[in-house]
Amino acid sequence: MSYAYLFKYIIIGDTGVGKSCLLLQFTDKRFQPVHDLTIGVEFGARMITIDNKPIKLQIWDTAGQESFRSITRSYYRGAAGALLVYDITRRETFNHLASWLEDARQHANANMTIMLIGNKCDLAHRRAVSTEEGEQFAKEHGLIFMEASAKTAQNVEEAFIKTAATIYKKIQDGVFDVSNESYGIKVGYGGIPGPSGGRDGSTSQGGGCCG
């Protein structure tokens, strides 16, 4: 299926916060309670619609372990959006957000859209981080914020789509040079060509996560 734009996302955060589960819920609409630790980087893709235009999201799910941090850093380059995830039941995952954000700011393009997600809101009875704290962190650092549940699917769709809508608005506002793929945006059919007038006319073929 052809797309007007392709947006590249990266999902970052500590091990065990539910990054892979969020991706699986978004791409396959299912929850896998037992998930192997991500080794390096996993990949998923899905078509959505923004402003009546087909947008393909290409999503890189990264490992949270410190030993894979250098691999993760290489994926910041060329990402239009990032989902920064913590677990509302584990305080330390919230405390580590500043370190993840510093990495993202250092290695990504300055206009990358970052969505902060407090995952596992279905476990509110075990909450260790208040919603207000998440909101405050997002406000201080210029992030979008949502609490979500990869298990119940609450706000999962909304988080991915709101991030895409923000990126799309930046394109409309001329923030991105869409002819420069280092911004994590690729122009397909019906998208606004870059200043050079060039347009990537490729279409995505096949199904599954690699389509």
UniProtKB/Swiss-Prot annotation:
Known function: Intracellular vesicle trafficking and protein transport.
InterPro entries hit by this protein: P-loop_NTPase, Rab_GTPases_membrane_traffic, Small_GTP-bd, Small_GTPase
Natural source organism: Arabidopsis thaliana
One GO MF term: GTP binding
Binding, GTP: 13-21, 61-65, 119-122, 149-151
Modified residues (N-acetylserine): S2
Family: Belongs to the small GTPase superfamily. Rab family.
Residue ranges annotated as motif Effector region: 35-43
Lineage of the species this protein comes from: Eukaryota, Viridiplantae, Streptophyta, Embryophyta, Tracheophyta
Gene: RABB1C
Pfam families assigned to the protein according to its UniProt record, in alphabetical order: Ras
Single biological process term from Gene Ontology: endoplasmic reticulum to Golgi vesicle-mediated transport
Protein name, entry field: Ras-related protein RABB1c
NCBIfam families assigned to the protein according to its UniProt record, in alphabetical order: small_GTP (TIGR00231)
Localisation per UniProt entry: Cell membrane
Organism domain of life: Eukaryota
UniProt keyword list: Acetylation, Cell membrane, GTP-binding, Lipoprotein, Membrane, Nucleotide-binding, Prenylation, Protein transport, Transport
One term under GO cellular component: plant-type vacuole
Keyword check for DNA-binding: no
